[in-house]
Design a protein with these regions (language model features):
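Short low-complexity, flexible loop/linker segments enriched in glycine and/or proline
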Residues: 16-20, 67-69, 124
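C-terminal hydrophobic helical "lid"/dimerization subdomain
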Residues: 9, 16, 39-43, 85-138
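A structural signal for short secondary-structure junctions
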Residues: 19-21, 44-45, 72-73, 128-129
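Glycine-rich phosphate-binding loop and adjacent beta-alpha segment
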Residues: 31-103, 138
Length: 138
């Protein structure tokens, strides 16, 4: 898994890592989704690849402008995801039990921790691409 602060960096690295074949998936995790972000994500996935959109968009604007031919000929998929398509009432309890039993390694996924006084720094680091999974500890 790789994370990028901008589309140009993502495209260059994906091309390098996949020898030009494209990524299997691109996850759009930005706060506000726009057509530029969706188009860039669609461009970096290869044949049969999937773009997953988790952010929200301005409901008054169209945010997906892609070639229907590209989708069909390369069998690409664009889908939205809310809470990872899980059932929060069931799955969160299950995940907590797995974590308590030592079967789900969440601590290793945290890239940086912040205390309450560092909240603004945490958001700035996220905007600057300095952390992927920052956690505020209270």
């Amino acid at each position: 898994t790789h994370a990028f602060a901008d589309a140009a960096s993502a495209a260059a690295k994906v091309d390098e890592l996949t020898w030009g074949q494209g990524a299997d998936a691109a996850l759009i995790l930005v706060g506000t989704v726009d057509d530029e972000v969706v188009s860039a994500a669609t461009a970096v996935i290869g044949k049969g690849g999937t773009v997953v959109i988790t952010g929200l968009a301005d409901p008054a604007k169209l945010t997906v402008h892609v070639s229907g031919t590209d989708l069909t000929l390369h069998e690409k998929t664009i889908k939205g995801s809310l809470f990872g398509s899980c059932n929060p009432q069931y799955d969160i309890v299950r995940l907590l039990r797995l974590y308590d039993a030592g079967q789900l390694m969440l601590d290793e996924l945290v890239t940086t921790t912040y205390n309450l006084e560092q909240v603004n720094q945490g958001y700035q680091d996220l905007r600057d691409g300095k952390n992927i999974r920052g956690v505020i500890v209270h």
